[in-house]
Amino acid sequence: VIAGPVAFQSDYGERSNIETNLGNVGFGVGIVHYLNFAYQADCNCYAKYTYFNDHFKVRNEIDFHITNLDNFGPEASDNDFGGLRLRAHKGRTQVLEIGSQLEYFPMSIRDFSAGAYKFAPYVSVGAHFVSFNPSATTSLREDGNIFGQVLNPFTTDPTDTGPAIIEGFNVGEGQMGTGIDTRVGDTWAITWSVGTRYKLGILSDLNIDLRWHYYTSNWVDGLNPDPRPVNRVNDWIFWMNVGYIYYLD
């Protein structure tokens, strides 16, 4: 079992903005199963030694993470209609991932299992199938409809309205021809990670993992404005998780 904070790098907020990076953080959990080639299950003994068996494992897992998303940065802080609409625009995405990674341990898996050392660092690469369910609302309307019209409080005309979606987000390939899409979708993710195991006992380890998931879609967060310099990559996450691993006989 693994769990930890997820930093979602999306189209909400501003690239390389500290407030964005620290603000759009969710939480993820996962259930993990390992294929350990160093052992044979039928005899509960070591398998025939090969370099692959002693240095590689396959990790299969199911992950689920949720992140609430806000627009941070200088534009959202502007005291005008655009800034107001950005601050009022709230997002949320729920993501389910299923996939596998190949883990490489530079040190011997057998020696670590036998207690020769406490730490076993590793690197991994893999792929996940991803199902995502985003949402988007505005606090400027009682019904929260992000596709509706809102009053402009920065004019003297009480009937002056504009779209809840700001310019730059209001044209795209999403719902109603905008850069917002709250429909359920699916995609793939390429994953990389670095981490280490810490031996707690003969049959248990503590695992610390730093993970990057790069999605092959830019709609995972439900927001995909027209291509421009600030929208040059797809959505991705950085996930720091801690897990408990128990060895099954």
Regions found by a protein language model. Name each.
Residues 33-35, 104-106, 196-198, 246:
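Residue-level signature of outer-membrane beta-barrel architecture
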Residues 21-27, 54, 94-98, 119, ...:
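Residues that define the transmembrane beta-barrel architecture of outer-membrane proteins
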Residues 3-9, 62-68, 106-108, 127-133, ...:
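Transmembrane beta-strands of outer-membrane beta-barrel pores
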Residues 1-40, 245-247:
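Short glycine/proline- and aromatic-enriched beta-strand/turn motifs that initiate or cap beta-hairpins
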Residues 12-20, 67-96, 132-187, 219-235:
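Extracellular/periplasm-exposed beta-strand and loop segments of Gram-negative cell-envelope proteins
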Residues 36-55, 92, 108-120, 200-204, ...:
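Short loop/turn motifs that connect adjacent beta-strands in outer-membrane beta-barrel proteins
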